Amino acid sequence: MSENKTYTECSINGICSINNAISSLHEVVLLHIKNLAFYILKLKDFGITNDLIKADVTNILYGVFINAAYSQAEYNEITTNLDKYTSQSIYLYEKYCRENNLEIEKPNRKVKKTYNIINAIRTGEKSSLKKYKSLSPEQKNTYEIVYFLCRSIVIKIVELQRLGIDYKDAYYSVLEIINSCELSGFCFDNIKDIFDKSIGVYLELMKLIFATEKKLFGKIEEVDIDTSSYEGKSILVSGSNLKALQEILEQTVDSGINVYTHGFDMLVAHTLPEISKYTHLKGHFSTNRHNYIADFSTFRGPILMSRVYMENIDFLYRGRLFSQDPYVSKGIEKITNDDYSSLINATSQAMGFKKYNQRTSIHAGFDEEKILEATDEILEKLKSNRIKYLYVIGICNCEQDNSYYEDLLNNLPDKSYAFSFSYNKSSNNIYHINSLYDGRLFLKIFRNIEEYKDKNISVFMTQGDRYTVANLLTIKHLGFKHVFSDNFPDNIIAPNTKEILKNKFNINFITDVKSDIEKTMY
C-alpha cells in the first residue's frame, strides 16, 4: 500500500478543523439561500435577473465556503438581505405568473427567520442533526461531494471576478445544485444531470481563468524564482489574486519596499512578464508549501491573505494581516475598492528584514509551443494505435510519494508511454513536463480529448489540495478511461468520501504498482 507523505498543517495540528458554531451559522445561511434560489431560477427562466443580488449572494456563498466567522452585525446583515431578496423575488415571480396566466409554484420548504446569532446557531445545529439522521451514510457522503463541487465553483467564480470577468452561468449552476438538494429523500440520480453540468462549468471556469491571466499578464516564460529574503521593508502577498499583486507592485514602485509572493498558486506570478517586470518583486517567500504558520511568523512585514488557504490560523497574526475576503475576523483589516494604502503604510511599523538570507531557487514556467509539439506527436501515435497505453502522472508539478511513481514508470507495459508532470524522469517512453503548479498545461495538452476518448489513457492525481475532489471529478468528466488518486490525508479526502468516489464515480485509489497497472490494461 502506498501512502501519500505530504501532510499539511491541517492534518498535523488540526488548524483547519471547523468550529461547530460557525458551521451551524453557515447551515442557516445556506437554508436562506436555498429558499431564495428557487425564485431566482424561476425568474431567470422568465428572463428576469438582478446583478446586485447576484453579487451579494456570491459574496455570501464565498464566505460560507471559506469558513468565515461572522459578527452579530454581519450575520444580521446577511440574513436580512437574503430575506429581503427573497421577498422581492417572490413578488416579481408571482406578478409575472399572474400576468401570464402561469401556475404559481412554491418550494416545499420553510425557513425560520432567525436574526439572533445564538438562536441561529441552535437552528443550524438542529438542521445539521436532521441531515445526519435522515440520510444514509452513502447519501451523506454523496451530499458532501456535491458540497465540495459547489465550494470549488464559488471560489473559482470569485477568482475570475477578481480578474475582471463575470461568468454568470457558474452562479446559476451553483444555485441549481443548492435548490435541487433536498434532504428529504435525497437521491443523487435526481440531480445527476445538474451535477454533470456543474462539473462542466467548473472546467470552463478554470479555462477562463487561465486564458484571462494570459491576456492580462502575458505568455508564461521559463524562470528561476528566487526564494531568498532581502534587506529592507517588505510586503507579503499570499493567495491567488494576481490583480492585487500587480496593483500593490504598481503602488510601491520606487518606494523602497520589497514585495514577495506566498503560496502554491502565487508561483505563476513570477512567470508572467507583466508582473515579473517589477524589479522590487523580489521572490517567493516560503519554507515549505504548506507551512503557513512558520512562514507568516517569520515574515517581517504586513501580509495580504485569504482564508481560502489558511482556514483557522488567521487569529495568530492579527495586526499584520489584511484581506480582500468579504468577511474577515476581528483584528484583520479588510481591503476594499483595491485601496492598498493601509497595507503599504503598515510597512513603516514593521521590522523588515535586517539582512540578506539566501535560499535556493525554484524553476518554473514552460515553453508551451515546444511541449505541445512533442505531446501532439505522442498523441498522434496513440490515435493510430502505435501506442496502446498512455499514462499521465499528475496534472501539474507537486509533491508526491516518489517511490510509488518511480516504480510505476519503471514497470510500464509494452507499447505504452507516459507524460510525467510531477515525477522528474525522462526516457524513450517517458516525457517529463516541467509545468506550473496548476492544471493549465494539462488542459492544453488534452484540448482535443474527444479524439482520444476511446483510447486507454490513465491519469494519476498526485496533488492534494482544496480542489482535489473537484479535479478528480473533472478528469473523469472529460472522458479519461482510468482515473487514480493518491492516498491523501483525511482532511483532503475523508475515508467515507473516498468510498463514494470509488463506488459511485469509478475513481481508483493507488494500492501497489502491479495491481494498479493491471487495472489500466482493460
Where are these regions (language model features)?
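Electropositive, gly/pro-rich neighborhoods at or near active sites that engage anionic ligands
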Residues: 33, 40-219
